[in-house]
């Protein structure tokens, strides 16, 4: 959102109504879709953003409603890992609610206590490959990432090189449904996996 000299939201320069919709649909979404073609390789955050925006469409029909939503989102902070993690929990709660409401989100969501119990039994270790062949929302992978990032069962502090292994060479997923595919990528990014390996 545009800011004034004091870093506050600039209502005078903010697009709204049809102007905002034209910008989002005609410039912003095509630009973000283009990240996929401009990325160095498929294992980058840029590529994944391009994939997400290749799969979704802007469903908001009112530029005024979109402006209101953007102003609310602009007030949120996503700088620290804790803030990103908080957002990831909100995101997963929304997926869970979709399933509870009888919508298709339920087929992508496995209850987190069940996932945590399975992780406690398996006790994955850094250096192992974790694959989910029917990823849904990627809840298993996100919980396994959190478990390993926090040092596993013994809560041993992990090194920078261990974190790089977690980011790049640990988590792999497959999801054939396009909505679940986008949900999985977003969920993994919000949990801190910067370039999810989802096919």
Per-segment meaning from a language model:
Residues 1-126, 196-199:
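Non-catalytic, mostly N-terminal accessory regions of nucleic-acid modification and defense proteins
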Residues 105-199:
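Conserved S-adenosyl-L-methionine
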